[in-house]
Amino acid sequence: MCTMPLMKLKKMMRRTAFLLSVLIGCSMLGSDRSDKAPHWELVWSDEFDYSGLPDPEKWDYDVGGHGWGNQELQYYTRARIENARVGGGVLIIEARHEPYEGREYTSARLVTRGKASWTYGRFEIRARLPSGRGTWPAIWMLPDRQTYGSAYWPDNGEIDIMEHVGFNPDVVHGTVHTKAYNHLLGTQRGGSIRVPTARTDFHVYAIEWTPEEIRWFVDDSLYYRFPNERLTDPEADWRHWPFDQPFHLIMNIAVGGAWGGQQGVDPEAFPAQLVVDYVRVYRWVE
């Protein structure tokens, strides 16, 4: 009798199908490129097929409990198994209600900064979101350095692949912030989509970032586009589109905060988990 957990078995089946598709794509590389259609090519991934802490070759941590510019309540810990761990084929980021370093909650904020960054590409994350008032999971991107303007943020941009706030369950948001378009001015640009099973089932949250635009998807359903105005408006500049430089990935659960805590925090909602099946990054090949 098979005793393998159903979730892990399904993951292995998806992983096998994914590897077959990659192998087929690789076998085509030897063919005449004039006959090969443009496509997305995998360049980086974490399938979480191991156990323990997140792979230190791929992930680092943002650490601290200073509110993170959003009046957040959690302390982000470093390499603490209670807050970030891999097992059963998934990554679990867990926010907990517990005293730690002067804060009432703990969580983790994983980053690829210093490990991997990209300019343009398709970024694909299969995840199940946490429940509960006061939870604020996010999968997003920030630039590696300050290239434009007098401030790192918002001058150099932010790409929110997926955000969800617990007081507005099953509504997923995709947003950009720039010098011209940001929440401090009330001018941020983005879209939202209802995902009725976001907290009970896994869904694929993705963006496709090109020199022309950024596109947001849930399960390959397009729900928002942000165009590069510098290509059509002679007055537009980096203030409108700073997205021509390397960005790194971030995954976290915040607690409370200016947005996530608008209707308070329910302590009974914790521990709360953002569960990630995989993270995949592709580049466009002509």
Swiss-Prot record:
Signal peptide: 1-30
Thermal activity profile: Optimum temperature is 85 degrees Celsius.
Gene3D superfamilies: 2.60.120.200
An example Gene Ontology biological process: carbohydrate metabolic process
pH dependence: Optimum pH is 7.0.
Sequence ranges assigned to domain GH16 in this UniProt record: 48-286
Active site, per annotation: E158 (nucleophile), E163 (proton donor)
Molecular function as annotated in GO: licheninase activity
Entry annotated with the keyword Hydrolase: yes
InterPro entries: ConA-like_dom_sf (IPR013320), GH16 (IPR000757), GH16_AS (IPR008263), Glycosyl_Hydrlase_16 (IPR050546)
Keywords assigned by UniProt, alphabetized: Glycosidase, Hydrolase, Signal
E.C. no: 3.2.1.73
Catalysed conversion reaction: Hydrolysis of (1->4)-beta-D-glucosidic linkages in beta-D-glucans containing (1->3)- and (1->4)-bonds
Domain of life the protein comes from: Bacteria
Function (record text): Shows activity on lichenan, beta-glucan and laminarin but not on CMC cellulose or xylan.
Family stated for the protein in its record: Belongs to the glycosyl hydrolase 16 family.
Name of the featured protein: Beta-glucanase
Species name: Rhodothermus marinus (Rhodothermus obamensis)
